Amino acid sequence: IGNAAEYVEIRTFHSYCFDLLGKVGSIDDSENVVDKAVDAVMDSQVERSRITKSILVIDEAQDMSEDEFALVRELVRNNDDMRVIAVGDDDQNIYEFRGSDSRYMGLLISEFNAKVYNMLENFRSCQPVIALANSFARTIGNRLKSEPIRCVVGGDGCVRLVRHPAGYYGQAVVDEILAAHRSGSSAVLTMTNDDALMVSAMLGRRGVKARLIQSNDSFSLHDLAELHLFYSDIRANCSTIIPDNVWAHAMELTTGEFAGSSSLEIALSCIGAFEKEYPSKRYVSDLFNFFGESELSDFCKAARNEIVVSTVHKSKGREFDNVYLLLRGMTQITDRERRVIYVGMTRAKTNLSVHFDGGIFHSIPELADGGGSAAGLSIENDPKLYAEPDELLLQLSHRDLHLDCFKGKSDIISKLCSGDALNVIDDRLYTTVNGYSQQVGRFSEAFRTKLSKLQQKGYVPISSRVRFLLFWH
């Protein structure tokens, strides 16, 4: 759109609300910032120019929360001629745990007498995947969308449904991956973090390279050591527009300081994404907001020979040639879980394998009797009882560590990098400095309880690595 792009603001609800309130965004203040911004607009405490808009476009409108919808209402109330365009798919509302609810997209339609355009063409998935997704979507209650999606792409594909007895049948997924030798991108999608970690460990034991998609739910990317250094160096050398030489110096400093860090690739991917979004003129404030609004999972890129392992939630917005969907323990499901499963199915382009237990598909007439009449669809029963895995992978966060233990250890910790090995002795973590063992961490009481239960099953901690190096303030 040329120069008109200079007049377009692209913001998250949270960053826009921080701006309305004249505050710098932070994780601690983000929970109630939208609610506070709505109150400020209603009380005329916000400059009129900040809320005067001619067009408002809402992406992923199915994920609006009550506060976010209230903000949209206020913007409409304050702009008589404003055009509102909302884009969303209520079948893909999978963030209810954050307060999102697709009924607010429905209220947007009913309250403002909106015209609805159904975009039903699917340019991603093959016909067998589309057929299963349509059949499964019909089991979701209170839908806005009533017409089935249509396959646009050609080519062959297949859907495989495998029913298991309850248990640890993640091994069946690993066995299928090893036997299939499928070309193209592949992903194992799970409903829980524990299952993603379990499958990742299983693949590793079988010599398969796996890329586990990680999240930064408990911290901001500002505080990731690699990005913290990059931003701090830029901030020390400029205050508004970032000159090319300052940018280059920060890149050189970061890549040199963290050459051995396993998180450097993710950090550089994040920086590269900012470069693409701002190819010519870059502002310090935009960089700060970009780091604050970004999700770590957006920058976890898999190599051609790697299997992506992720929860369905972290896979939203991605696509893969081959998807292995692990639905372990999903026996009694609600519409919330059905929408998550639907999103997982529709990540697949060509091949989809669904491993499940229970009666997830009993409500689909063409699948209820255990047969599959649709072309490219097979339904199988695997009666094998799989043993618990020999090896588990655990990811620790702030909640799993005794934070006070880090006090006074900044000199030792600053010498570590993501990926560095640590020794586990009892409930403590140690690194080796100049031939001497130095304590750098201690497990929290909650994690010690979890670890004790695993030890009662025969598991023993054998190794540990630094996941992320973070600034705590």
Language model features: what each stretch is:
Residues I1-S26:
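P-loop NTPase Walker
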Residues E9-S15, E31-A37, N305-H313:
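Conserved two-lobed SF2 helicase motor
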Residues S30-L56, R77-D80, E319:
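Short basic/glycine-enriched coil/helix segment immediately N-terminal to the Walker B
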Residues A37-T52, P148-C158, A236-I266, D382-L393:
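Extended, charge-rich low-complexity interaction segments
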Residues I55, Q62-G155, H164-G167, A187-R205, ...:
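Conserved helicase motor core of SF1/SF2 NTP-dependent helicases
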Residues Q171-K301, E306:
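Conserved helicase/translocase motor-coupling segment
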Residues S262-Y386:
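Conserved C-terminal motor-coupling region of P-loop helicases
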Residues I364-H473:
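Conserved active-site motif detector
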